[in-house]
Amino acid sequence: DEIYERMVYGGEHFVSVASLSPKIFRKTLTVNGVSKAYAMTGWRIGYAAGPSEIIRAMETVQSHTASAPATFAQYGAMHALNGVEDEIRPMLAAFEARNKRIHELMTAIEGIVCRRPMGAFYVFPNIAAFGMDSREFAQRLIDEQHVAAVPGFSFGAPDNLRFSYACGMEEIEEGMRRFKTFCDSLG
């Protein structure tokens, strides 16, 4: 799944697993789409590349489960995939600024441990210091401070939460202010 391949920060570069060696290339199914990097969420345009026998089997299944995406979505995806670097560069710069800011605010909160993400638009802080699992923590956070987070249980990490920073800087500032208030209340 390479849906976030264009959304990397801090001078990092994305490397496709399929590019690691000819042997790995022959065994890799790459799945991607236009929803994240090109802000086309909901258009349902994706694609896959891999061994021809797997792609043929996928085509067979897909042809019986879904119709083609709308024509405008197909044209939009075609335009996006044929080089719109100048148009997405400001969006990626904004995401990188949000990434830095949310990480800065989050790591200033006592008890929070969080590595700075180098791609996508999520942070995944560890909340183990607060003595409750991520489901209870997330429920209380939304009930008490109206801040939404996805419990890490969904990702096999019960001591973590996932926050999205696909919003404006003002929302990040306010959300992190409320998150800090909540964490501080836990003592």
Model feature map: region roles:
Residues 2-187:
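PLP-dependent class I/II
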